[in-house]
Amino acid sequence: GGPGQFNYFQQIDVNEDTGLIFMLTTSGKINVYEMETGKFLYDIKIPDKETAQFAMLNDTLVATFMLNSSGQQKERIYISSQKENILNTFYRSDLFEVKSGTRWLMMSGIDRYMFRYKDLICYKEFYNDTLFVVTEKELQPRYIFDLGKYSIPIDCRMEACDGDWKTYNTIAAPYIRNQVIETDSLLFMPYNYWAGEKQRERHMVLYDKKAKECFSVPGGYIKNDFPGALPLRPATSLDRNTLVSVWEVGDIMKEAEKNPEVLEHPQLKKLTEDDNPVLMVVYMK
């Protein structure tokens, strides 16, 4: 116990087979808890780096991901053991120079760089066209997403613009950033434009893994056939066929203006404007 356990948690990972919860803290450690009781068990030290996200390869082996906010962060993923020993390092080649030396980074709270599908640890950067599977020995390419003319060049990134928002908002406007959420039958790919007037627009593409076909979802949300139900735009997956959509209360109220039946749902009837975001869990057939 002790004050050292109480930190800001950046991310969590779960091993349902062993009943353990792993929480990345701002103190350079991963706290490990028992799922059933919430009891603190032990902590795992990670490399003394600016870790953005992590995933557990097993209960003692950690993959930690570093953002390239400086332009010169050569290491992108460390594989380390419980004793902080670095066992392997995966590097990046898309380096650039920021003249002022100031760090700039475009990211949001829903960005996912490392995530799970079945027993695989998957990794994808928004600046990278490849989704990799992370193992102790290598990064294995799993999917390549050809954005073509919509792939943002290095010199159009916010980091490379050295904080010049006006320039960035113009030169980055034609390019898109996409997430990837994998289920057994589909790849969900929500995307939006990096900057400009279309930045707030929401788009989504689905890829049918069996038919090997890709198709666009009008309006960026999947229509919900249940009366008064909210449409679906997944933010993440819980397992191979369970999706989670996150709704801010303000967005639900706007949706209710178009469809008042939304607030007739038993769990939304008492919703107020200062409530926390609403999580919608969707189970795929």
Kindly give the residue locations of the regions a language model identified.
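A short beta-strand motif characteristic of beta-propeller blades
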Residues: 1-4, 39-45, 87-90, 96-103, ...
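Loop-centered beta-sheet repeat module
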Residues: 78-139
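Short beta-strand elements that form the blades of beta-propeller/WD-repeat-like
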Residues: 19-25, 59-71, 78, 112-133, ...
